């Protein structure tokens, strides 16, 4: 077999392959054996008919067609390997010559990974927000915990932001009742803004048993975009009652006996969360700087595939209803054109990041242990809300375990490179990235990096 490569662009090549017939004996034998099973010729057992009779019955064409179909995957793969081509995606194959008993020739155009020059990570400088755990941050966390143990108590004063009401809602457009906007016994927190535009303003200052009326533009449904008259009947009013921050609360809300112990534990939790955020900031800033210093062309077909995949995933969340997507975009003040542009930019970023990390992984050559791969699989299953055993079964069936292995390898490669970067916080303090991305922290960072790519 002979092969040659023509560079069509930075990201696409054309491979020409010539295969002499003497190399196709296994495929010829297999083709005749398959056809022999399809014909019954008097005097011969099934599958034992000689080739001359098969040619007479079917002609030589079906044999050659089967030979070509059988040999294409292996010969294409051989040409890719021999020419050290980093192919991406599926090739466009064309059979250019079939000379019986002489040669088969085909061409394959395929996208390839562009040449990527990695930066000197030791020359990269990044700055991230400083980690400051003050009393205010701890108080905020404790207030959040306190709110989770609050109770709702009836009241009859004028409504304020943050208080709760029970409503009977109805709406009409041009005097016609809007059924989908009619409900009873709806609980709502004033100020949340997650129901109907104008509702919060209408409720403020009202009391139990009051009825308010206001106009608003409906955001969805059959009357989307129409001006509607909304009537809200207030059937109950409640306010949040918070427990005191004392030892009794500490025992109720945690495993601690005293408020002092709970406060100290909360401070540790806040510090851990802020440090995790700082680690993520370091990773993001380093990756951003590295990508900016390593410009390279992107295979258009791969970007298109990524953009299509992103759109398909989003539509899947909307029952593949294109009209529903347009409605969501309109409610967000975004046009379809703006969405498609942003989707394309996101796809380019995703493809650029993965190609860069693939090259980085080949350079850094991190080792991935079975435990690290298992941890990542469990992490991914959890992020999808799936049973781990069921998820692993799906991975094995679809042959996707290698992809998750590559995810971990990319994450570890980036972690190794980050350890050479110069990092300071916003207060000018030097940060040793090994504290976050050293050997012990790499597996967890690999999970985070893989999750960000999905």
Curated annotation (Swiss-Prot):
Coiled coil residues, start to end: none
Record bears the keyword tRNA processing: no
Major subcellular site: cytoplasm
Stretch list, region Disordered: 427-454
Class of this enzyme: isomerase
EC numbers, comma separated: 5.2.1.8
A cellular component annotation (GO) from this entry: cytoplasm
Catalytic activity, as annotated: [protein]-peptidylproline (omega=180) = [protein]-peptidylproline (omega=0)
Domain of life of the organism encoding this protein: Bacteria
Compositionally biased spans, kind Acidic residues: 438-454
GO BP, one annotated term: chaperone-mediated protein folding
Key word Cell cycle present: yes
Biased amino acid composition, Basic and acidic residues: 427-437
PPIase FKBP-type domain sequence ranges: 162-243
Gene Ontology terms for molecular function: peptidyl-prolyl cis-trans isomerase activity; protein folding chaperone; ribosome binding
Domain remark from Swiss-Prot or TrEMBL: Consists of 3 domains; the N-terminus binds the ribosome, the middle domain has PPIase activity, while the C-terminus has intrinsic chaperone activity on its own.
Family annotation (NCBIfam families): tig
Similarity-based family: Belongs to the FKBP-type PPIase family. Tig subfamily.
UniProt cross-references to HAMAP family, sorted A to Z: Trigger_factor_Tig
Protein name in UniProt: Trigger factor
Organism, scientific name: Corynebacterium efficiens (strain DSM 44549 / YS-314 / AJ 12310 / JCM 11189 / NBRC 100395)
Organism placement in taxonomy: Bacteria, Bacillati, Actinomycetota, Actinomycetes, Mycobacteriales
């Amino acid at each position: 077999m002979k092969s040659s490569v023509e560079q069509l662009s930075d990201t696409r090549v054309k491979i020409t392959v010539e295969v002499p017939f003497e190399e196709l004996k296994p495929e010829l034998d297999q083709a005749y054996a398959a056809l022999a099973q399809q014909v019954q010729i008097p005097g011969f057992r099934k599958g034992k008919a000689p080739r001359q009779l098969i040619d007479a019955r079917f002609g030589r064409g079906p044999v050659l067609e089967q030979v070509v179909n059988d040999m294409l995957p292996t010969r294409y793969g051989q040409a890719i390997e021999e020419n050290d081509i980093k192919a991406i995606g599926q090739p466009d194959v064309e059979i250019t010559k079939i000379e019986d008993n002489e040669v088969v020739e085909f061409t394959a155009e395929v996208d390839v990974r562009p040449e990527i020059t990695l930066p000197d990570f030791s020359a990269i400088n990044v700055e991230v927000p400083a980690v400051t755990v003050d009393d205010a941050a701890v108080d905020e966390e404790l207030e959040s915990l306190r709110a989770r143990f609050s109770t709702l108590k009836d009241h009859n004063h004028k409504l304020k932001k943050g208080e709760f009401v029970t409503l009977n809602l109805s709406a009409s457009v041009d005097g016609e009742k809007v059924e989908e906007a009619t409900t009873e016994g709806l609980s709502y927190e004033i100020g949340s803004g997650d129901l109907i535009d104008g509702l919060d303003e209408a409720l403020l200052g009202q009391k139990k048993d009051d009825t308010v009326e206001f106009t608003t533009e409906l955001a969805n449904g059959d009357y989307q975009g129409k001006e509607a008259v909304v009537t809200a009947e207030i059937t109950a009013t409640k306010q949040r009652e918070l427990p005191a921050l004392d030892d009794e609360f500490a025992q109720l809300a945690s495993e601690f006996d005293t408020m002092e112990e709970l406060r100290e534990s909360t401070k540790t939790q806040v510090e851990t969360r802020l440090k995790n955020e700082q680690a993520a900031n370091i990773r993001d800033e380093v990756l951003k700087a590295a990508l900016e210093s390593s410009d390279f062309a992107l295979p258009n077909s791969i970007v298109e595939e990524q953009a299509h995949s992103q759109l398909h995933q989003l539509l899947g969340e909307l029952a593949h209803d294109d009209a529903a997507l347009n409605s969501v975009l309109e409610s967000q003040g975004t046009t379809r054109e703006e969405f498609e542009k942003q989707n394309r930019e996101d796809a380019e970023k995703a493809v650029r990041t993965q190609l860069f990390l693939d090259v980085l992984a080949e350079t850094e050559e991190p080792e991935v242990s079975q435990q690290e791969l298992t941890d990542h699989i469990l992490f991914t299953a959890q992020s999808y809300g799936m049973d781990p055993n069921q998820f692993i079964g799906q991975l094995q069936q679809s042959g996707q375990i290698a992809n998750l292995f590559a995810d971990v390898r990319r994450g570890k490669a980036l972690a190794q490179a980050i350890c050479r970067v110069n990092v300071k916080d916003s207060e000018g303090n030097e940060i040793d990235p090994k504290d976050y991305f050293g050997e012990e922290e790499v597996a967890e960072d690999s999970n985070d990096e893989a999750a960000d790519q999905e």
